[in-house]
């Protein structure tokens, strides 16, 4: 299931980038290009990450839960330019990234190798946010794969 989550996330970014004809600046921008498909793909990516709960020791399961739940909120409040929806979206995105990275630090520190994408972010200033987001996703995915 974790591999399906990775595929759904990559399809989301790929479809939006193809439609935009360049790399999107952030995962959330995908909604403005592929609308309902972004909602479906990001929601499926979040739901397929729920096995994180099974592989996580009891003390840290709340981080896995909040990362998945926050990603569902990001998917259901995609219009980040609107006032209320943007606040929900931004708070959920920050919570998702923070919980995913905190989970990796607490449960599988070697998964932080996913943060290697931060090096790309340092050089590609135009697309910095997408690289930061993909780094957080990669860290969580690597952690789950290593725990399996």
Predicted features, each with a name:
Residues 1, 55-60, 101-112, 126, ...:
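Transmembrane helix interruption/hinge and helix-loop junction motifs
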Residues 1-56:
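N-terminal topogenic module of multi-pass integral membrane proteins
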Residues 4-8, 41-44, 63-70, 96, ...:
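Hydrophobic alpha-helical transmembrane segments of polytopic
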Residues 10-19, 73-80, 119:
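Transmembrane alpha-helical segments that form the membrane-embedded catalytic/substrate-channel core
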Residues 42-54, 92-101, 137:
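Core segments of transmembrane alpha-helices
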Residues 54-56, 76-83, 122-126, 146-148:
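Juxtamembrane "helix-exit" motif on the non-cytosolic side of transmembrane helices
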Residues 61-114:
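Membrane-proximal helix-loop-helix units in multi-pass membrane proteins
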Residues 108-148:
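Terminal transmembrane helical module of multi-pass membrane proteins
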């Amino acid at each position: 299931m974790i591999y399906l989550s990775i595929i759904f996330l990559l399809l989301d970014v790929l479809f939006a980038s193809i439609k935009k004809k360049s790399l999107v600046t952030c995962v959330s921008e995908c909604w403005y290009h592929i609308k309902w498909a972004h909602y479906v793909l990001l929601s499926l990516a979040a739901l397929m990450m729920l096995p994180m709960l099974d592989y996580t020791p009891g003390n840290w399961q709340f981080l896995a839960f909040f990362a998945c739940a926050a990603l569902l909120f990001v998917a259901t409040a995609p219009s980040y330019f609107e006032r209320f929806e943007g606040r929900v979206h931004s708070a959920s995105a920050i919570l998702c990234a923070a919980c995913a990275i905190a989970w990796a630090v607490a449960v599988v520190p070697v998964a932080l190798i996913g943060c290697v994408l931060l090096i790309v972010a340092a050089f590609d200033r135009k697309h910095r946010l997408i690289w930061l987001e993909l780094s957080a996703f990669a860290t969580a995915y690597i952690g789950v794969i290593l725990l399996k």
